[in-house]
Each structure stands twice: as C-alpha cells, then as structure tokens.
Amino acid sequence: MTVLIHVLGSDIPHHNRTVLRFFNDALAATSEHAREFMVVGKDDGLSDSCPTLSVQFFPGKKSLAEAVIAKAKANRQQRFFFHGQFNPTLWLALLSGGIKPSQFYWHIWGADLYELSSGLRYKLFYPLRRLAQKRVGCVFATRGDLSFFAKTHPKVRGELLYFPTRMDPSLNTMANDRQREGKMTILVGNSGDRSNEHIAALRAVHQQFGDTVKVVVPMGYPPNNEAYIEEVRQAGLELFSEENLQVLSEKLEFDAYLTLLRQCDLGYFIFARQQGIGTLCLLIQAGIPCVLNRENPFWQDMTEQHLPVLFTTDDLNEDIVREAQRQLASVDKNTIAFFSPNYLQGWQRALAIATGEVA
C-alpha cells in the first residue's frame, strides 16, 4: 500500500508545529501512515524535535503545490491528507483533475471553509473553491463545521475530528476548588489576528459590563503586528480605564498562557466562524465559560458535550457568568470529546478512512 502523505500547505508556524509534534508523539509510532509530511515553511528545528517523522519543507505555497500535483499525477493510488487547506493552487488542481477526489482528504481548520474576506480576488476565487470542495474525497471537521459544510455539499462524506490542542489531562480538575469572587476578568480574543475583531469585541464587553471588569487581550501572535496592537489599545482606552485594560503584545510561552487563562472568569469571542478551539479548550478545562457568536457553529460541539454556552446576544451580568461557572464545574471534563486524549480516537479513525482501511 502507498503511504499516506500529510500536507501542511501554508506557512502557519504555530499550527503546523502543533500538528507535527502531535503526530510525532502520538501517532507515528503505531502507524506508517502518520509519518510522511510536506510542509510550507522553515525547518526551525522541527526535524530534530520530530525524529519519527519524515518532513519535506518548501519555501512557499506554489512550490509545495507543484510537488503535490506531480506526485498525484505520477501515482493515482497516492493519497493526501490536507491539514487546513489555504492553498489556492491545490483547490484548482482538484477542480481540474490534477488531483483526483480519491486522493484528496481534508481536515477543515475553519478559515479555510468560511468566506469572510471581502477582497476582489477572494470574491472571484470563492466560487471556484466551492466547486472544488464538491470533489473532496472526505472532509474531517468539528460537528458545527460539518453541519455548515453539508448545507452546500451534502453529498461529500464528513467525519468528526478535532484539532489536537496541546493539553495536560491531569489539569482537568484544576478549577474545581477555585473560589471566584470580586471584579471579573474577561479574556477577549485568542490571538492578535484581526479575525478576532478586537475593537468590536471590546465595545460589546463594555456595553454589557461597562468599566466594571478587567479586560485582557492577548496579541503576541502573529509577529510584526505593532500598528494593529496600538490601534486596539487606543480603542480600548476609550472604553476602559487603564487599570482595567491589559493588552499583551509579547508572545507567551504555553505555561505562561495557561497561568493567564486561569486568572480569567470569562472568555469573549465575537468572530462569526469556528476558530480558536485551542483557547476554548484551555478555558473550559480551567472552568471558565465562553461567550460565542451565534454564527460560530462550535456551539453545537459544546452543547453536544453538555457544556454551558453564552452568546454575544445574551444579556450578560455577573450572576449569569457565575452560574455558567457553576454549571461548568459540574461537568466531568475527562469525557469531553475534543479534549486530550479523547480526540486521539478520531485521528486514528481519520487515518484509517484516508488510507482506505475503513470504508
């Protein structure tokens, strides 16, 4: 059997590193179909930190796409597993037959599914991408994204799968003995990316709570974002006193980020699509409820796991937040499907489907 090749077709360092390390640590030892990778970006020590993987790095999307297409044409039995698919050339290859449907398996990350960019080139490309998506062999995604995708592509096979968020299962009970009282701290957004709509989110938080809460805005990622960070800071200072606004411009290491999250009482995410599952998982693990946009279909995954969900359209106050905290504390977090190690079973099944071992 031809070994499955995994494709990380865009230079998204944080996510790519997470996927590679997950495969190296959790999957590669037991499956030959979890070892071959083609990645856009620099090595930056990844090969050394993932010794069980065979990783080929490419300088850009185009060079990787050309290599994938060449492999696909040379051997029609070769199958590819695309982790997030932001590479236009690969969509066009699927649409034109350069890559066959039986060769194309796609794990939806979120931004690669929704059509939120307003630029002309995106508006011209989106219809072509929709046509190509009809030809995917199988999609893997959250429950909410599967539902969203099925509305326009009902004939494409869909399977439940969660991004392998870095988590320590031993921390699942860490919040149970914590007492929450006094001024609330609210986390706004999961990164410095503009898709978080930070300014709109800050205004929404202020409308709900006024200047009675402390707001923390993590913006250390992506890099070279100083102008936008300052824009958010100034907008925040028009709404909140300086002591109640903390805009973080430095990237935090994982343990420091966990410590930050544990100091919060609520996560507030205004974006209208699925994103930031990693931060949501870590907040839920810490017993911290989250406010979502009703257009973000991840609420379906949360309710399926019997987790409380608050919405940006709800009338929120401290009593409602504290009640959501109490409800969350009563949930057995060891049973949540999108937590580690529970998502591992989904990955094992995904590999079996993509290789044809499971019909």
Curated annotation (Swiss-Prot):
| Protein location | Cell inner membrane
Q: List S-S links within the chain.
A: none
**Involved pathway(s):** Bacterial outer membrane biogenesis; enterobacterial common antigen biosynthesis
Q: Name one Pfam family in it.
A: Glyco_transf_56
The annotated topology with respect to the bilayer is: Peripheral membrane protein
Q: Show the catalytic activity.
A: beta-D-ManNAcA-(1->4)-alpha-D-GlcNAc-di-trans,octa-cis-undecaprenyl diphosphate + dTDP-4-acetamido-4,6-dideoxy-alpha-D-galactose = alpha-D-FucNAc4-(1->4)-beta-D-ManNAcA-(1->4)-D-GlcNAc-undecaprenyl diphosphate + dTDP + H(+)
Question: InterPro entries recorded for this chain?
Answer: WecF (IPR009993)
Report TM segments.
none
User: Is Translocase one of the keywords?
Assistant: no
Cellular-component GO terms for this entry:
plasma membrane
Annotated GO biological processes are:
enterobacterial common antigen biosynthetic process; fucosylation
What are the record keywords, sorted?
Cell inner membrane, Cell membrane, Glycosyltransferase, Membrane, Transferase
Q: Give an example GO molecular function.
A: fucosyltransferase activity
Where it mainly occurs, coarsely classed, is membrane
| Enzyme Commission code | 2.4.1.325
Output the superkingdom of the source species.
Answer: Bacteria
State if Transit peptide is listed as a keyword: no
Primary role: Catalyzes the synthesis of Und-PP-GlcNAc-ManNAcA-Fuc4NAc (Lipid III), the third lipid-linked intermediate involved in ECA synthesis.
* Family the UniProt entry places it in: Belongs to the glycosyltransferase 56 family.
Q: What is this protein called?
A: TDP-N-acetylfucosamine:lipid II N-acetylfucosaminyltransferase
| Native source species | Escherichia coli (strain SMS-3-5 / SECEC)
